[in-house]
């Protein structure tokens, strides 16, 4: 999914995760095909043969994918990071884009100038603009700023298509930046620490999604039952810091997260408190058992909600960092406050700090429509309650507490299909 053509051809005998959406004609074509793909008896990364012929629009021609100069330029970048340079060059050339915005997360900015030079060298007559504002996640895609700067194409790196390309205000290309790792150590570690026959739910960030799917048949041959869960519309196995699938503790023995850091894993732990969670760091090659203080988190959030119920004036913060803020969610909360005769003030912020809000001391409660984890992780540091939209609806009596509706489990579904990060205009009209 997104690999350049030469990689697809080179890996024609290997597996890859199934695409989420397959058209009827493609499905019929596949059904008529007698070609079978055998699992590779290997513990190295398993990338897959394409399950369908790429559309002409997306298929990278050999004059790009096999260009020795382009391949030499790609060698300047880490070999285990797939920046999909040929695909990007092809998209720029075919779209006629002249001014291209490049948006990277902090950890990949060190490659930004190299990628910029490569693209301008092989796409004559174009210029690139590296966007330097902080990018925390897929919700921070900044098509608004890119458009305001006169760009006609935005290339967003290392996050999935949280904001669909038919919604962004300019043409957008998502580059997942698949990271290849040697999985032999991971397999050996799991075999040494987990009993065969156990059921493992594997999750991770989008960079390791292909690896997760490649691991499944290998782990199953080793005697494990492997589940790759999904919370739509995210990809199977993909989790975000605010969005993760809900699993059955009766069916899942372990939750395994592939990736560095805990931020995304904590989302899955909050949503699945009774399932033991483990994290495999592919960089340090360590497997660790992870824990989370659910009692403390629930207490802090309930205290904030209780304090908000007596607040005489509210403040509503709409996050302006990329696409974090949803205006429809804001309008819905405004409507509920108006119904109850509660005065409020609106505030537009790209980043939210305690000192900034403390300056407006007449506001007794804040609800931020930006990142739920800001309230969950750092809400205690703010002088007034800082609620998520979900918590605001509880405080206003619109929704019941998670103890009643989710059997005591705090939901992490902000960007799920019906999550509050995706509020539609119709939801506001029905209030």
UniProtKB/Swiss-Prot annotation:
GO CC aspect terms: 2-(3-amino-3-carboxypropyl)histidine synthase complex; cytoplasm
The organism of origin for this protein: Emericella nidulans (strain FGSC A4 / ATCC 38163 / CBS 112.46 / NRRL 194 / M139) (Aspergillus nidulans)
Alphabetical list of InterPro entries matching this protein: DPH1/DPH2 (IPR016435), DPH1/DPH2_1 (IPR042263), DPH1/DPH2_2 (IPR042264), DPH1/DPH2_3 (IPR042265), DPH1/DPH2_euk_archaea (IPR035435)
Catalytic function, reaction form: L-histidyl-[translation elongation factor 2] + S-adenosyl-L-methionine = 2-[(3S)-amino-3-carboxypropyl]-L-histidyl-[translation elongation factor 2] + S-methyl-5'-thioadenosine + H(+)
The family this protein is said to belong to: Belongs to the DPH1/DPH2 family. DPH1 subfamily.
UniProt biased composition (Polar residues): 28-47
Entry function: Catalyzes the first step of diphthamide biosynthesis, a post-translational modification of histidine which occurs in elongation factor 2. Dph1 and dph2 transfer a 3-amino-3-carboxypropyl (ACP) group from S-adenosyl-L-methionine (SAM) to a histidine residue, the reaction is assisted by a reduction system comprising dph3 and a NADH-dependent reductase, predominantly cbr1.
Keywords, alphabetical: Cytoplasm, Iron, Iron-sulfur, Metal-binding, S-adenosyl-L-methionine, Transferase
Cellular location(s): Cytoplasm
Binding site residues for [4Fe-4S] cluster: 139, 242, 371
Subunit structure, as described in the record: Component of the 2-(3-amino-3-carboxypropyl)histidine synthase complex composed of dph1, dph2, dph3 and a NADH-dependent reductase, predominantly cbr1.
Pathway: Protein modification; peptidyl-diphthamide biosynthesis
Gene3D superfamilies in alphabetical order: Diphthamide synthesis DPH1/DPH2 domain 1, Diphthamide synthesis DPH1/DPH2 domain 2, Diphthamide synthesis DPH1/DPH2 domain 3
NCBIfam families according to UniProt: diphth2_R
GO-annotated biological processes: protein histidyl modification to diphthamide
EC id: 2.5.1.108
Pfam families: Diphthamide_syn (PF01866)
Listed GO MF terms: 2-(3-amino-3-carboxypropyl)histidine synthase activity; 4 iron, 4 sulfur cluster binding; metal ion binding
Cofactor stoichiometry and binding remark: Binds 1 [4Fe-4S] cluster per subunit. The cluster is coordinated with 3 cysteines and an exchangeable S-adenosyl-L-methionine.
Protein name: 2-(3-amino-3-carboxypropyl)histidine synthase subunit 1
Cofactor: [4Fe-4S] cluster
Region of interest: Disordered: 1-57
Annotated transmembrane regions: none
